[in-house]
């Protein structure tokens, strides 16, 4: 067969789908129980979509197609996200001719040079990639209702008015507030950064360090050296301080409110603290070595402790000053032990090695299972030899910190006897009240880079607008909604619960970027994770809005709060519709239709997206729905999918390790791409794109097309007499229908593909082998029937070639709208399946015997099936599952007692092997029916149950496991 022209087939059916508006739902449907509304996070248009995105968008399309074929009225809409700073940042970098950005857009995204320079205007970026994304989605065969398409920001006024309404509603509820809060900040551009504004380090946590002001006397001046710690309770156990002798430190005046102090901190810390409500005036810079060997005073205990050298101290982490608590910190203990062995380092700084030798550890925490110094014991237990054993040290630190926090009891007055997790906060609070300590915010990992290409810092912002996700009552409603939602996979539920717990105020607006101006404070622009939480409701009315816009009958400025309140929050009212018609100029009957559509489609059945959106978008989606909509409109389910890699490597635009979705379609055909990414891993697992494997799959898809095309010419005559192998094929087809259906109902796409494609393909290969040489009506009936079912099973995954094959089969209309197959009760036949499995296994066993025994020129095989009494033993064991019970039951029969010793051994063996599943088949009948086939497969004469016991094998026969002798 000639190579299949996937592109021609795809274009043919995409054109027909668009012309016939196949994927626009029935607008007159009434029974709500047969509606299915599914959405996926709309794509952000800063570049081309890659094959990782392909997974995110193909999953809901496959589910939408499946439900449509099940008879549901399905809504699967799409829109485009352009809000925020990233697109503006890209335009800025292209304007500045940034080489990295130019490389990505010219070489990776293949943007023509004449268009690339237009990207200095953010609107040109949006225009180009919106068109490209739409084309990609159409080329992929996504069954989208394009009549509802829109994009975000004030560039699309109707949606912008919807967002204004959302924010007024939240503000009226007290859920949008103004105040001071820590945010990720781009210090160059001067704007807060949401998750989508981060190019690198999006998931990095913000840590809250307590910085404790140790006191240094220098030239008669009292100077503070603030040591940063996540464990303020351990200040009672400090034995020394650590500084990096090679790092640059500063002496600086630090002003906060009406307080002015002199601090010594790293140069990097001085810069970062200047963003956290402190005015920093650097007096001098110097290397850390200047302070090594000096003493500082612990402000809590009054102890004088020495400053020791430590190159492990990172000046870019917190203050660059570290307090050492070796009894409870494995790193500190090991660093001290290393220093004791490296006296030359101490002598370099005129430190007497005996000073370090004589450092006494201070025990603070009683921990069950450990002695006085848990850190020392954990280090010994894990076999840590030095600071070079980084992995083991990290493990030791994690183990001790976790154990002490959850199970430790504090030993030092006035907190003695209290749990560490309680003491930690008490001490932190007390130290701050006394002015001994302050708070500093720091990233848990670095770097954190904004999409403008700048290193982010943490800034305390005043007069910033926030959505208050920390509101306790709101959290409770979100928990209630989550408890009533279906989450796929269920294992992700705990992550949602955790996010609801820790979510706090979230900056919702910034002063740069594209978006909708905050309606009451328009110098602020609503950011991208805040204008994308309830747009699923807007989809329900957007086709009407779009039509009115196209006809020139819409004034977006008239879409006020009352308009959206009525559509989304009030009961039906003819009077209100007339009032709103007067105000908006929209006919009352259209307003009524909008209201009807919202009430019909809501609640949303499924929200789909990748797992990285759980800590932000997907949880914000729950919060905003429970705030704005009544309980009956709260979402029903969220499906979370995994990520994609390319040839085993994480995809990276900057490194060129990325495959654009559209390029994958061009290379392989949309249906091959769809089937590959759906069949490679379950939707919640990560997948790896391998070009070689995609090529293999393409050949299998072509074989599918070839087989069904051939079977399309057959006539499926009802009432033909079927042989057992025909019944087996129909039974297996039933299993494929059942397996694929269950897989798709549970979003287990890999399982569904295994059943719908691979299982049918493999079973068909076996059936064709078993029926080789036959060309009768029964076989033609089976193959024609199989073709009809198989094409429908494959339609959600490979819609284009399925449509082409459906047409060849003479199917009515589009296969996309055909009835999803259901198991035929008349086809079920477990016994025939067992018999066929029995034949398959026997063939493999005989091949193995010939190979292992190295039998050359084998002529015949003698097959001995299990006698009746062995079947009875197997059935008794399956029923009783106990030696005594089975033996007792069997020995009641005099005939069985004749085989007493053999039965005893057989029961023991079956119980040991846990052979508790047994279903009786007529082994001899199965063998005689398949005798010709077995002989042909093996090239041997097959003799079934002869009188002669060849090689004494007869006694080895067991139920479902015949004895074999080959000569």
From Swiss-Prot:
Encoding gene, per UniProt annotation: leuS
Source organism superkingdom: Archaea
GO molecular function per UniProt: aminoacyl-tRNA deacylase activity; ATP binding; leucine-tRNA ligase activity
GO biological process terms, semicolon-separated: leucyl-tRNA aminoacylation
Sequence positions that bind ATP: 653
GO terms under cellular component: cytoplasm
Name under which the protein is recorded: Leucine--tRNA ligase
Family the entry assigns: Belongs to the class-I aminoacyl-tRNA synthetase family.
Substrates-to-products reaction catalysed: tRNA(Leu) + L-leucine + ATP = L-leucyl-tRNA(Leu) + AMP + diphosphate
Subcellular location: Cytoplasm
Organism annotation: Thermococcus onnurineus (strain NA1)
UniProt lineage: Archaea, Methanobacteriati, Methanobacteriota, Thermococci, Thermococcales
């Amino acid at each position: 067969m000639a190579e299949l022209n996937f592109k021609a087939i795809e274009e043919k059916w995409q054109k027909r789908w668009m012309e016939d508006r196949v994927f626009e739902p029935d607008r007159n449907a009434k029974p709500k129980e047969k509606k299915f509304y599914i959405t996926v996070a709309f794509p952000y248009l800063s570049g081309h979509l890659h094959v990782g995105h392909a997974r995110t968008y193909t999953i809901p399309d496959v589910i939408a197609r499946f439900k449509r074929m099940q008879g549901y009225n399905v809504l699967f809409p799409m829109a485009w996200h352009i809000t925020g700073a990233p697109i503006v940042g890209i335009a800025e970098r292209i304007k500045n001719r940034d080489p990295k950005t130019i490389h990505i857009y010219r070489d990776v995204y293949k943007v023509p040079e004449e268009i690339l320079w237009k990207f200095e205007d953010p609107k040109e970026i949006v225009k180009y990639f919106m068109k490209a994304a739409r084309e990609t989605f159409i080329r992929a065969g996504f069954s989208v209702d394009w009549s509802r398409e829109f994009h975000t920001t004030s560039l699309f006024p109707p949606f912008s008015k919807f967002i204004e309404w959302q924010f007024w509603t939240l503000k009226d509820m007290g859920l949008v507030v103004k105040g001071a809060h820590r945010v990720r900040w781009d210090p160059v551009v001067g704007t807060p950064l949401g998750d989508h504004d981060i190019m690198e380090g999006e998931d990095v946590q913000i840590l809250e360090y307590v910085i404790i002001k140790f006191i240094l006397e220098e030239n008669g001046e009292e100077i503070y050296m603030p040591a940063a710690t996540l464990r303020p309770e351990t200040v009672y156990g400090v034995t020394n301080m650590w500084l990096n002798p090679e790092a640059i430190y500063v002496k600086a005046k630090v002003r906060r409110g009406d307080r002015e102090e002199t601090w010594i901190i790293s140069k990097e810390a001085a810069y970062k603290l200047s963003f956290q409500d402190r005015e920093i005036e650097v007096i001098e810079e110097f290397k850390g070595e200047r302070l090594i060997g000096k003493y500082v005073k612990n402000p809590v205990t009054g102890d004088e402790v020495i400053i020791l050298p430590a190159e492990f101290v990172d000046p870019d982490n917190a203050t660059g000053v570290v307090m050492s608590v070796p009894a409870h910190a494995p790193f500190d203990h090991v660093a001290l032990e290393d220093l004791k062995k490296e006296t030359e380092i101490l002598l370099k700084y005129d430190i007497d090695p005996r000073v370090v030798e004589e450092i006494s550890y201070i025990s603070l925490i009683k921990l069950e299972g450990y002695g006085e110094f848990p850190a020392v014991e954990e280090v010994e237990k894990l076999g840590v030899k030095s600071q070079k054993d980084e992995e083991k040290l990290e493990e030791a630190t994690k183990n001790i910190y976790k154990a002490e926090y959850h199970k430790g009891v504090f030993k030092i007055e006035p907190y003695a006897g209290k749990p560490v997790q309680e003491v930690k906060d008490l001490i932190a609070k007390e130290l701050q009240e006394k002015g001994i300590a302050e708070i500093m915010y720091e990233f848990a990992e670095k770097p954190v880079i904004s999409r403008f290409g700048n290193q982010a810092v943490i800034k305390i912002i005043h007069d910033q607008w926030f959505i208050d996700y920390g509101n306790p009552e709101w959290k409770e409603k979100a928990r209630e909604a989550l408890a009533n939602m279906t989450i796929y996979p269920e294992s992700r539920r705990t992550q949602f619960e955790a996010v609801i717990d820790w979510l706090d105020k979230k900056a919702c607006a910034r002063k740069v970027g594209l978006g909708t101006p905050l309606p009451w404070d328009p110098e602020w622009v609503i950011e991208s994770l805040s204008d994308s939480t309830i747009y699923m409701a807007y989809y329900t009315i957007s086709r009407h809005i779009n039509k009115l816009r196209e006809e020139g009958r819409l004034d977006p400025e008239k879409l006020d709060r009352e308009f959206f309140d009525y559509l989304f929050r009030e009961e039906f009212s003819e009077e209100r519709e007339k009032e709103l018609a007067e105000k908006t100029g929209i006919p009352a009957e259209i307003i009524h239709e909008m209201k009807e559509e919202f009430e019909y489609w809501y609640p949303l059945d499924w929200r789909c997206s990748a797992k990285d959106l759980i800590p932000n978008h997907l949880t914000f989606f729950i919060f905003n729905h429970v705030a704005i909509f009544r309980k009956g409109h709260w979402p029903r389910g969220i499906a979370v999918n995994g990520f994609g890699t390319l040839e085993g490597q994480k995809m990276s635009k900057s490194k060129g390790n990325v495959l654009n979705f559209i390029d994958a379609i061009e290379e392989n055909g949309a249906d091959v791409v769809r089937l590959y990414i759906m069949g490679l891993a379950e939707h919640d697992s990560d997948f790896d794109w391998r070009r070689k494997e995609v090529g293999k799959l393409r050949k299998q898809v072509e074989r599918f097309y070839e087989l069904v095309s051939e079977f399309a010419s057959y006539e499926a005559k009802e009432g033909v007499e079927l042989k057992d192998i025909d019944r087996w094929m129909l039974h297996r087809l039933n299993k494929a229908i059942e397996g694929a259906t269950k897989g798709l109902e549970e979003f287990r796409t890999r399982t569904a593909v295994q059943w719908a494609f691979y299982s049918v393909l493999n079973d068909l290969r076996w059936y064709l082998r078993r029926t080789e040489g036959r060309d009768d009506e029964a076989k033609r009936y089976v193959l024609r029937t199989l073709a009809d079912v198989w094409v429908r099973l494959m339609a959600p995954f490979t819609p284009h070639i399925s449509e082409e094959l459906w047409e060849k089969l003479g199917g009515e209309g589009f296969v996309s709208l055909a009835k999803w197959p259901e198991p035929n009760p008349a086809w079920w036949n477990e016994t025939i399946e067992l018999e066929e499995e029995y034949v398959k296994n026997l063939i493999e066993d005989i091949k193995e015997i010939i190979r292992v025994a190295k039998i050359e020129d084998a002529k015949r095989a003698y097959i001995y099936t299990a006698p009746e009494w062995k079947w009875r033993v197997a059935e008794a064991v399956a029923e009783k599952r106990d030696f005594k019970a089975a033996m007792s039951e069997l020995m009641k029969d005099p005939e069985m007692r004749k085989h007493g010793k053999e039965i005893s051994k057989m029961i023991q063996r079956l119980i040991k092997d846990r052979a508790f599943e047994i279903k009786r088949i007529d082994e001899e009948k199965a063998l005689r029916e398949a005798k010709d086939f077995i002989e042909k497969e093996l090239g041997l004469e097959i003799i079934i149950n002869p009188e002669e016991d060849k090689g004494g094998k007869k006694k080895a026969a067991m139920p479902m496991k015949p004895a074999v002798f080959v000569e």
